[in-house]
């Protein structure tokens, strides 16, 4: 007889008397999963060896719990909260266009979009295909912006910051979740995937072999987008570019929103 391997005591810290069918518990559960899938973003504020070590494993835990979600509503709300936790900051730029009311609306819209994408992934019949669908969401790049990039799972920890590391993280989560494999086979598969995705060599920084100039405008954000300042700000940038040309610079790098 094959034995199921229980790697994680999932929600064993929840008191037994708590009604797990209550709406409050379900909201807490999907939000907790979304936090696990977003942990790399927020643990970056507390950089130390401990947080860097556990970060990818928290992401794996989040993927396992996502697979354990057995209805499309849970997938939707996990995607909804992931969208908000990853992109809440996008709405802040509307402040500088006197559109303050859009600050909460924009992340909610983004949350609904990712909620729908996660829900579409649930429509796939098998759990492995659902996980593949979640993985493929990272290839959706509207407006040329690299949105939900699962590569963030490999920013910290032992896994190689490449598709090899990312794929191994997803596969580890799947085989931990999978209940039809015996304990010892499961341990062996997970270990093989771990060492397959391991980063063995430190990545060397690549430098530009160009004579470039980095321009820092030092213009405050609340002044940059005012209509009356557009011409003066543009004139400053043009002067900096012309000066760089006179200095025989091959490349001029401007601030992102210059």
Give the positions of each predicted feature.
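Membrane-embedded alpha-helical bundles of multi-pass enzymes
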Residues: 2-198
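Soluble catalytic regions of membrane-associated enzymes that act on cell-envelope
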Residues: 202-258
